[in-house]
Amino acid sequence: LETRLYECTECEKTFSNQSVLSLHQRTHTGEKIFKCTECEKSFMKRSQLIVHKKCHIEERPYMCTFCEKGYNQHSKLIEHIRTHTGEKPFTCTECKKSFTKRCNLTEHLRIHTGAKPHKCNLCDKTFHYPSNLVEHQRTHTGDRPFQCTECDKSFIKMSKLMVHLRIHTGEKPYKCSECDKSFSQQSTLVVHQRTHTGERPFQCSHCEKSFSYHYAFVVHERTHTGEKPYKCSMCDKAYSQRSNLKLHQKTHESKPQQDSPNCEKTFEQESAPKTATMDQLHESAGLEKVPELPEATNSVESPEAIDDYEKNYIPWSPLSEYLGVFLPPEKQHKCTECDKCFLEKSKLVVHQRTHTGERPFKCSVCDKTFIRMVHLLEHRKIHDGDRPYTCAECGKSFIRMSKLTVHRRTHTGERPYICAECGKQFSQQSNLVVHQRIH
């Protein structure tokens, strides 16, 4: 008799019985049904749980001779010793990269094979690593578990929080070797270095013009495609640049809204004498008009021309890249401590408090102080007893949505904080920090 084979619908692997297939499918779904009663960790296999439970037993017979850490498994001790010796015995045959653990090599190999076994059940997107899937799923749930203690801003990834914290600390670890300018992000340094190298990596497939900045490239491509993604909510006009939309919206502020049969005219057509011209609007808004990109031989800007364009119309700050608004340097509100730029002076004043330590908003009940009024108002809820965020599962209520989000994990079992060393997962960031000390 032929042996019946059970096939996985995700990766087409076959198995001799249904139970083994079910066990295998958990590698795709991430399901971990075997939970430790001592801590929050859970496992795909019962055997993994049994091994894990030993870590809660005091007996750790396998001791490290370098640092005296103890382990309940010899294999764990061997893995740990490699952190002292630097040994990486598991080598990728494709790129020769080495790893201390076999499981890390297995995950790395997916980069070469293209295997993405971890699938989102909401949008069918697939990922190489389970941690990437967990991060992606937060785009659906809105969960932002990594919260800044200075300003309460929250993030999907720990790496994003770490970059954000540099705004408060002023740390700029990425230094340009050409001009000694420093940056808080490596990607920002890479883009800055193009001002020295003249590199223009963004090339238009329609006319072969090339650009140093991705934003300039995107805006240019719209001259070919006709795309106008920035739409006015007042009259349905659309523009290829956000700055043009902002300028157009000022025409609604300066005159009553009227229904017009010519609503679909472009902004360039609006510049007739009956309305303000583009130059007048730029002047009234304190903005500098964005010129046409200069023509040059081979349809690529000369180094001098692009240098002039980028220096005068794309000042080096997150401002132009993020908002698409081009401000001349004299119009910017710039922090003297970290070079961050702001559209409004009031925003700069608030930001500078992260450097000076000034906290002008004081609670009249407990004398606690805050950088921003909104933080004081949120704090006052503690004294007022206002807890507007209520758990639908158990009725417990909280002052902040972020606190409710953490609490909900006690019901859902979600553990978004993942240890990069061993894959252990936690429901709270503080628990991950404590755990990481064992590594």
From Swiss-Prot:
List the molecular function annotations (GO) for this entry. Answer: DNA-binding transcription activator activity, RNA polymerase II-specific; RNA polymerase II cis-regulatory region sequence-specific DNA binding; zinc ion binding
The record's keywords, sorted A to Z, are: DNA-binding, Metal-binding, Nucleus, Repeat, Transcription, Transcription regulation, Zinc, Zinc-finger
Segment Disordered: which positions? 246-275, 285-304
Pfam family for this entry, one: zf-C2H2_6
Q: Where are the zinc fingers (C2H2-type)?
A: 6-28, 34-56, 62-84, 90-112, 118-140, 146-168, 174-196, 202-224, 230-252, 333-355, 361-383, 389-411, 417-439
- Which InterPro entries does the entry mention? Snail/Krueppel_Znf (IPR050527), Znf_C2H2_sf (IPR036236), Znf_C2H2_type (IPR013087)
SMART domains, alphabetized: ZnF_C2H2 (SM00355)
Subcellular location(s) per record:
Nucleus
The organism sits in which domain of life?
Eukaryota
Q: What is its main location?
A: nucleus
Q: Which GO terms describe its biological process?
A: regulation of transcription by RNA polymerase II
User: Looking at the UniProt record for this protein, which Gene Ontology cellular component terms does it annotate, in alphabetical order?
Assistant: nucleus
Q: What job does the chain carry out?
A: May be involved in transcriptional regulation.
Return the similarity comment: Belongs to the krueppel C2H2-type zinc-finger protein family.
This chain's protein is named: Oocyte zinc finger protein XlCOF28
**What is the protein's species of origin?**
Xenopus laevis
